[in-house]
Regions:
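Glycine-rich, flexible N-terminal cofactor/catalytic loop recognition
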Residues: 1-66
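A contiguous loop/helix-start segment that scaffolds small-molecule binding in enzyme catalytic cores
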Residues: 2-8, 86-87, 166-236
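Short glycine-rich anion-binding loops that position phosphate/pyrophosphate groups of nucleotides
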Residues: 14-16, 93-97, 177-178, 205
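Short active-site oxyanion
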Residues: 31-37, 114-118, 170-171
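Alpha-helix capping/helix-boundary segments
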Residues: 43-45, 95-96, 125, 179
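Conserved helicase motor
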Residues: 64-71, 146-150
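Glycine/small-residue-rich loop that forms an oxyanion/phosphate-binding "nest" at active or ligand-binding sites
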Residues: 67, 75-117
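Class I SAM-dependent methyltransferase SAM-binding "motif I" and its flanking Rossmann-like core
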Residues: 105-163
Length: 236
């Protein structure tokens, strides 16, 4: 019986046309040993791998969809290549698999079935934003998306600010790019004037902007964010 393969977690770019700067050569080399992939969207995964210019033919690669709608019962079939002794890679739509990403489901399955998990180096917008924020990097929490409804969003912001103050904990959020300004407005409106707020937009991209000010300083500014991926962080 052949030795089983490994599950590789493969980061992708978090801003367009940044492959050369953020995807290490070690990842490109490792990718050459992987022909089977679990991806959120086959089209974007193929486009990303094509941009790295390491495969002679993308058509020879095998892709299976793993997204937020995937069920645990589907994983056994997805992991067939590993049982056959071949490596399997998880590609995130943006950044690191398993971090704010459905890849965590497959990673959990791998551990439960004694399959070696190998994380590869690459960009994470959440960690890069935290690094550049100047806020507490020893104690922090990522909350994903806040409620869309403004009233519910403001209520959640108040509760999380209270938690931040009690625990000295940085609170981290993301938002759909077209709602960036709505969330920024709610944060500036709902947070205490002395609370520190960082807004990081298009990290690693050509329009990268990472600014941190007390909320009272943000109130003096005209905040108009582009419709690009953004991370929001605050510390009370």
């Amino acid at each position: 019986m052949s030795q089983q393969g490994k599950l590789f977690l493969i980061p992708t770019v978090i801003a367009e046309n940044t492959q050369e700067g953020v995807i290490p050569s070690s990842v490109r080399i490792k990718l050459l040993s992987i022909q089977h992939f679990l991806v959120e969207d086959i089209r974007t995964a193929r486009r990303h791998l094509s941009s790295l210019k390491i495969y002679t033919s993308i058509e020879l690669l095998d892709f299976k969809v793993l997204n937020k709608d995937s069920a645990e019962t589907e994983l056994s079939e997805m992991f067939t290549p590993i049982i056959q002794g071949k490596n399997l890679g998880i590609l995130s739509e943006s950044g690191c698999p398993g971090v704010a990403d459905p890849g965590a489901l497959a990673v959990k399955y791998a551990h439960q079935n004694h399959i070696q998990v190998v994380p590869l180096t690459g960009p994470s917008s959440i960690l890069l934003a935290l690094m550049a924020s100047g806020l507490n990097g020893q104690r922090f929490a990522f909350h994903g998306y806040l409620p869309i409804d403004s009233k519910e969003s403001l209520s959640a912001i108040k509760e999380l600010e209270k938690e931040s103050r009690i625990k000295n904990q940085t609170q981290i959020f993301i938002e759909t790019p077209h709602r960036n300004n709505q969330l920024a407005t709610n944060l500036i409106k709902g947070l205490n004037p002395e609370t520190l707020l960082c807004i990081a937009v298009d990290i690693t991209g050509s329009q990268e902007s990472i600014l941190m000010h007390p909320v009272k300083e943000w109130k003096k500014k005209s905040v108009e964010l582009p419709k690009l991926p953004a991370i929001f962080l605050f510390l009370a």
